[in-house]
Amino acid sequence: MAEQSFMIDWSRVPDFFTRWNKRFDVDAMNGTVGNFEVVYSSYAPDNIYDCLSGDVLSNDVQITQTVDCGLVWDEQGTISISDDVIWTIGDEIIPLKAVFIRNKVNGYVMGYSINQTSFDITNQVILDADTVLWSIHTGGYV
């Protein structure tokens, strides 16, 4: 089966996604430093553990696309993905079934959502584009 290209219908995405393409660095629990990427999939199993091998995406995850990204989060440490984010192939609309946040260096999954619209990334530390260190675990600047 030929690989199909997917694209976001950006007209359906809220204004806060204007920060989408800014890069953020993460100091992962194992000490490696790398960029986040978002992994989109139009397939989602019933159980998250079917997607993961340890904390790494398993080979049977049908990856639609990966995108280098910045993240939008609130003070509770939740990263929001809009319900209106959709994928299209021509005129066909394909709903997102699974989204993962992954460390590009080691492949570890930092957060995920299956048939939902948010990620819990408690205990991760994010460095934003203005070099402000934000600790989601403590809920404040550090």
Question: Residues of each region from the PLM?
Answer:
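Small cysteine-rich, disulfide-bonded extracellular modules of the LU/uPAR three-finger superfamily
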Residues: 1-98, 103-142
